[in-house]
Regions:
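A membrane-interface helix-boundary motif in multi-pass transporters
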Residues: 163-180, 376-394
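Cytoplasmic helix-loop-helix junction between adjacent transmembrane helices
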Residues: 113-150
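Helix-to-loop junctions at the C-terminal end of transmembrane segments
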Residues: 61-75, 165, 279-293, 378-379
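C-terminal ends and interior cores of transmembrane alpha-helices
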Residues: 85-103, 303-315, 402
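Juxtamembrane intracellular "pre-TM" segments in multi-pass secondary transporters
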Residues: 1-10, 191-230, 254-257, 419-431
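Multi-pass alpha-helical transporter architecture, strongest
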Residues: 9, 65, 93-99, 180-195, ...
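Interfacial helix-cap and linker-helix signal at transmembrane-aqueous boundaries
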Residues: 38-39, 69-71, 148, 163-166, ...
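Helix-loop boundary and gating motifs at the non-cytosolic
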Residues: 3-59, 225-233, 237-257, 335
Length: 441
């Protein structure tokens, strides 16, 4: 209880949690039905795959730039403010630019949309999360607790997204703008005293440099150990978008008598799943302390293999809804251990760049590679074959990861991680042992 009270009294926790909450509200209200919206615009699976591939390519380029710039900015919010401004404008952009262009020239719309949507959301997510994680390390927070508010925000908007989509899909995008305005206000005006002091210290010309150099940041690409993890992420986390965003919504809606019912039930299910995901953000750090960072990552890929594979086996709404709930533990098992893996085995000052390259950019490369071919496979072979193919790829990646992902006590170049089972006995335990020994004597 005391720990909980202390967290709620931490102004940086309140600020960063509110910011990431509003970001995921702004994104989730339309992103959860983006694939359904593209279908409503007359695009088939292959064309939807092309849209996702182009988005991923733009996201890939932007994310690497974001990582380099933010690691150099440290705690400054300049890039976060740019993302907030784009989020605030997503409604007008889709209403007056993206949708009209999509009806006349799909490729032009895909190119323009990839820049705006990636800059504000897909690549933006990969900036907001490292910034929140950096605040957590600097101001004595638990990153998982702040990140849970992002999932909570996504869950809230997912609860209503399906119903709003059935009324008019454009409302989803305009609600995204409303949340974006709130996000912009938070990051523009809310500076807790400890953050102002930290920024003042960083601006002192006599202070020792704490931010990595460009050479340091580009040097991450020369790390063989990073490329080992990139391959693992490329063959696992990639499918969060390829499967869950590009294929699953339409598949799930098809299990119901009509499209409107499917959309409404999917929105509700998605909300329940993300609510549980939010809760699991607080549970996964406990799991990590029990099983370790490496094993938590492998557990995440195992859950993904089972979830996608079972979607290719079951074909009724109840079973698929139960399988969908596996997602609630899967996302935290990828997100939180990935961050901790980077700060464990690499220089923590490079956390934003490492997260961009090793986690997010790897996933985006996978989406560029897999989105269109799997979209074509889905059009030709249907749900079952496509889902089982993806599941087999994830299984192969899990086996690969078992042999190549480093143990928690191997090549520790960052902040050490000690599992609960390996921690030294506490002082109280030591005193009890000494007392027992004295009585025996």
């Amino acid at each position: 209880m005391a720990t909980t009270t202390k967290v709620w009294r931490n102004p940086s926790y309140l600020q960063s949690s509110t910011g990431i909450f509003l970001f995921f509200c702004s994104w989730g209200i339309w992103w959860s039905f983006f694939q359904r919206w593209l279908n409503s615009m007359g695009l088939n699976g292959a064309k939807v795959g092309t849209i996702y591939s182009i988005n991923s390519l733009a996201t890939l380029i932007l994310m690497f730039g974001y990582g380099l710039i933010q690691d150099n900015l440290g705690l400054k919010r300049r890039l976060v403010l740019v993302i907030s401004a784009i989020a605030a404008l997503v409604g007008p952009f889709v209403q007056f630019v993206y949708a009209p262009l999509m009806r006349t020239n799909m490729m032009a719309a895909a190119l323009v949309g990839s820049v705006v949507l990636s800059a504000g959301f897909m690549a933006g997510c990969s900036l907001i999360e490292p910034v929140t994680e950096r605040y957590s390390r600097r101001f004595n927070l638990e990153y998982g607790q702040s990140r849970a508010w992002g999932s909570f925000g996504y869950a809230i908007v997912a609860l209503v997204a399906g119903f709003v989509f059935n009324i008019n899909p454009m409302i989803n995008f305009w609600l995204g703008s409303a949340f974006g305005v709130g996000m912009l206000i938070v990051y523009l005006t809310w500076y807790p005293a400890e953050q102002r002091e930290a920024l003042k210290e960083a601006a002192d010309p006599n202070a020792a440099p704490t931010n990595p150099t460009i050479k340091d940041m580009l040097g991450v690409l020369k790390m063989p150990t990073l490329w080992v993890l990139i391959v693992f992420m490329l063959l696992t986390n990639t499918f969060y978008t390829v499967f869950d965003q590009q294929m699953f919504p339409t598949y799930y809606a098809s299990l119901f008598p009509n499209e409107a019912t499917g959309n409404a039930v999917y929105g509700t299910l998605n909300s329940v799943q993300v609510f549980c995901e939010s809760a699991m953000m607080g549970v996964v750090p406990i799991i990590m302390r029990k099983v370790g960072v490496r094993n938590a990552l492998l557990l995440g890929s195992t859950v993904m293999f089972l979830r996608i594979g079972l979607c290719g086996i079951f074909h009724d709404p109840v079973s698929i809804s139960i399988v969908k709930m596996f997602h609630a533990i899967e996302v935290p098992l990828f997100c939180l251990p990935a961050f901790r893996y980077f700060t464990l085995h690499f220089n923590p000052k490079l956390s934003a760049t490492l997260y961009m390259v090793g986690f997010q950019i790897a996933s985006q490369i996978g989406q560029v590679v897999f989105s269109t071919p799997l979209g074509m496979l889905h059009d030709r072979m249907g749900d079952r074959t496509t889902f089982l193919t993806i599941s087999a790829i994830v299984l192969a990646a899990t086996v690969y990861g078992f042999f190549v992902i480093k143990r928690d006590d191997e090549q520790v170049d960052g902040d050490p991680f000690i599992r609960d089972s390996k921690k030294l006995p506490s002082l109280a335990t030591d005193e009890a042992i000494l007392s027992a020994d004295s009585e025996d004597m």
